[in-house]
């Protein structure tokens, strides 16, 4: 586990973590953990990077306000648990092509959170989100609000049927 700060009252800000290996929470806790809402960090998980956690009470990555998380590798928790938790306002998650996220993207009770998706034109994806995100597909695909999802053009036979359900 990499702790961004020891306690919520003793926050570190401006930390940069770039991962190309494996960061694993082997006991209770997160792979990357910011204790307080102001524990600011920039986390980049490169294509060979793997971050894992199987603790139902903690996200795999938890960062504070004005933080950014960019994933091109694998970020994994159990399916119903948080993979990435934004613990402060005005943070951004960017999910890049061929990156894998298992678990929820959580911005519950936070404001100004942005989810940017960059999987390529016409690609399909689905992410379970919790809380309020501004959704951006950087390749121009239409994002279906609710949880973040898009249907690739390869499934054009069902595209019109699925998009009719968007809210």
Which residue stretches match the model-derived regions?
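Structural detector of coil-to-beta-strand junctions
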Residues: 1-3, 8, 29-34, 57-62, ...
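Beta-strand-rich solenoid/repeat architectures in extracellular/passenger domains
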Residues: 10-29, 42-58, 68, 72-81, ...
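Parallel beta-helix/beta-solenoid
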Residues: 12, 27, 38-40, 64-66, ...
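A generic structural signal for beta-strand entry/edge sites
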Residues: 40, 58, 112-114
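Ordered, small/hydrophobic-rich secondary-structure cores
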Residues: 78-79, 84-87, 91-93
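Extracellular/surface-exposed low-complexity segments
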Residues: 94-102, 110-167
């Amino acid at each position: 586990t990499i702790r961004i700060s020891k306690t919520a009252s003793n926050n570190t800000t401006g930390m940069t973590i770039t991962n190309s290996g494996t960061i694993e929470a082997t006991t209770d806790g997160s792979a990357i953990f910011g204790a307080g809402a102001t524990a600011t960090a920039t986390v980049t998980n490169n294509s060979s990077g793997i971050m894992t956690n199987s603790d139902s009470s903690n996200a795999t990555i938890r960062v504070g306000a004005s933080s950014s998380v960019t994933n091109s590798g694998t970020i994994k928790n159990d399916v119903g648990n948080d993979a990435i938790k934004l613990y402060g306002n005005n943070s951004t998650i960017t999910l890049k092509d061929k990156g894998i996220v298992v678990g929820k993207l959580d911005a519950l009770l936070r404001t100004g959170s942005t989810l940017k998706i960059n999987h390529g034109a016409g690609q399909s994806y689905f992410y379970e989100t919790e809380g309020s995100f501004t959704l951006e597909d950087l390749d121009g695909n239409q994002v279906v609000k609710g949880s973040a999802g898009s249907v690739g053009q390869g499934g054009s036979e069902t595209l019109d049927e699925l998009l009719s359900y968007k809210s």
